[in-house]
Amino acid sequence: MKLADLSSPAFLENPYPLYETLRRQGSFVSIGPNALMTGRYSIVDGLLHNRNMGKSYMESIRVRYGDDALDMPLFQGFNRMFLMLNPPVHTHLRGLVMQAFTGRESESMRPLATDTAHRLIDDFEQKSSVDLVTEFSFPLPMRIICRMMDVDISDAISLSVAVSNIAKVLDPAPMSPDELVHASAAYEELAHYFTRLIELRRAQPGTDLISMLLRAEEEGQKLTHDEIVSNVILLLLGGYETTSNMIGNALIALHRHPKQLARLKSDLSLMPQAILECLRYDGSVQFTMRAAMDDVSIEGDVVPRGTIVFLMLGAANRDPAQFTDPDHLDITRKQGRLQSFGAGVHHCLGYRLALVELECALTVLLERLPHLRLANLDTLSWNQRGNLRGVNALIADLHS
């Protein structure tokens, strides 16, 4: 197996057959010098919780793009994001942002998420059909993260396009030269936009996420301007692309399992459990990476120091050694912890907010449009990403 397999048309349409092959081939598969891949649940879980497995983002860039890419502003910008860093720097930056994503703060966003879902449906409810991607699943999390950042909602469309163009940076397989050009231009556009916004917040601070980072800086927890810009872009990317794609993935999974959908419609109190099962079944986040900071022993194998390990979360979530009948959606499943949010010190910061948004979005949609039917279920166009997986369009007949 090689990295190029993770960018093949077959994989991007349906990664799960390749994941099955990956698990069968062993605990680890070599995909290059000092680079391994694993899709087994126990290995993924063990390495995510191992403190000797850290981040080495620029080394992962070297593995995928070569030495010449290391100085590119795009990758330098991503390297400043706390998602890519190790303690104590990671701990410092994550701590600054964490206060906005506590359980209490995330739960306080439930009324906003519910109201946003209702308002979006108000705009298309009388139509006979609608593209749920453009009219619902993409604007919902974007409006919420824009509110949290106090970003003008009129800028949401241009921001969403730029964010989508940088999202492929997080793919396991390298981008094409053209994709790299587009991603670099999009990062520059976002950096310019937020530089201007940061200057405005310095002059007139508020209670938003950007002002919070600036206040932390003023209180002695120094951040450089570039660190603030990079981490604001990370918050936008994490708060938008992951959830928007997951709303669509959940709807697809439920409609492909009509008995499960019917059960959920009959008892919406099952929604939190159903969301977790949809995340396991076909999550938008498909992989993450770790680097061995020392030799790491796990289940009889040794990951040598300096090795980059591609942890295929989507494969772990379908591992039959962990989940009974893993290729079947079961919204009452109470078996095992899903890997979709990662684990350990780099566990997804915004997972509570994501769950709130997903629960509100699907609950309101099923309440308001109980007869909704997906019209293009057999002709879906996936977004051609190995990570942040989702569809380009999701056409729904609203009153079938």
Swiss-Prot record:
SUPFAM superfamilies: Cytochrome P450. It comes from the Bacteria. InterPro entries: Cyt_P450, Cyt_P450_B, Cyt_P450_CS, Cyt_P450_sf. This is Putative cytochrome P450 133B2. Its EC number is 1.14.-.-. It is an enzyme of class 1 (oxidoreductase). Heme binds at C348. It holds the Pfam family p450. Keywords: Heme, Iron, Metal-binding, Monooxygenase, Oxidoreductase. Belongs to the cytochrome P450 family. GO terms for molecular function: heme binding; iron ion binding; monooxygenase activity; oxidoreductase activity, acting on paired donors, with incorporation or reduction of molecular oxygen. PANTHER family: CYTOCHROME P450 YJIB-RELATED (PTHR46696:SF1), P450, PUTATIVE (EUROFUNG)-RELATED (PTHR46696). Its cofactor is heme.
